[in-house]
Amino acid sequence: MDGTSAIASKDADSIIVTPTGPLLGAEISGIDLTKPLTPAQVAAIRAALVWHKVLFFRDQDISYEDHVRFGRYFGDLEGHPVTATVPGFPEILFIEAADGMKVTDAVYPIARPANKWHTDVTFREKPSMAGILRMRKRPAQGGDTIFADTAAIYSDLPPDVKAKIETLDAEHDIIRSYGYRVTPEKAAKLRAEYPLAVKRLRAAIRQAQKLNLLGNNIGGTP
């Protein structure tokens, strides 16, 4: 899939996949996400996602209903136990920065986790297959969402480093990530529902048949 390519399928021949970078990312055009998709279109998008890892659908004025319908083509949707959701749509998280909001000591702890490299909801026993972001308002500057190819990062590690991390386990802890935002009672309920998830640092991506890094705090270290 080097350069611009069209998906060869009777029902998906209008879909155009245009890579945006050498390692990951592609724009998908020739499709309207405000309308139901055919199985062939869904299969084409899934194949593009496995290959390119990050997909961009530009100028899609989708509603909340469209957002949920599109997500369900790829599996069951998950809510979030802490982050606010859209009224009537528990599957959609509501992420907003108020106009003119200043970074103060009070808001910094809330903004800090999202302003560093992370993968969402890894505290679940089974990590999410993907997330679907919809931008409604873009800041005049900044506000970029940046993606990294963790499979490429792992592939480029020196052999001695790969050997060192071969058996390392990472601890994915919902309380470490969100405990400061909830009451002690709520934290106890979260811990009961989401026990500490221990996962191998070197994780497998089954669909792409590749190894990648799924990092977090390493067990036995500060």
Language model features by range: what are they?
Residues 2-222:
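Non-heme Fe(II) oxygenase catalytic core, chiefly the N-lobe of the double-stranded beta-helix
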